[in-house]
Amino acid sequence: MKVRPSVKKLCPKCKIIRRHGVVRVICDNPRHKQRQG
């Protein structure tokens, strides 16, 4: 999980979602998981 000020898609499989007001990126590749912090 990377915590970044700005999250973006790193590959075509990445999806940007909002959970409880937190922006996250979920992906098949676990190295692409991100959260806005």
From Swiss-Prot:
Domain of life: Bacteria
GO CC term, one of those recorded: ribonucleoprotein complex
An example Gene Ontology biological process: translation
Disulfide bonds: none
Keyword Ribonucleoprotein attributed: yes
UniProt keywords, alphabetically: Ribonucleoprotein, Ribosomal protein
Record flagged with keyword Heme: no
SUPFAM superfamilies cross-referenced by the UniProt entry: Ribosomal protein L36 (SSF57840)
GO MF assignments: structural constituent of ribosome
Protein family membership: Belongs to the bacterial ribosomal protein bL36 family.
Protein name from the UniProt record: Large ribosomal subunit protein bL36
Species this chain originates from: Solidesulfovibrio magneticus (strain ATCC 700980 / DSM 13731 / RS-1) (Desulfovibrio magneticus)
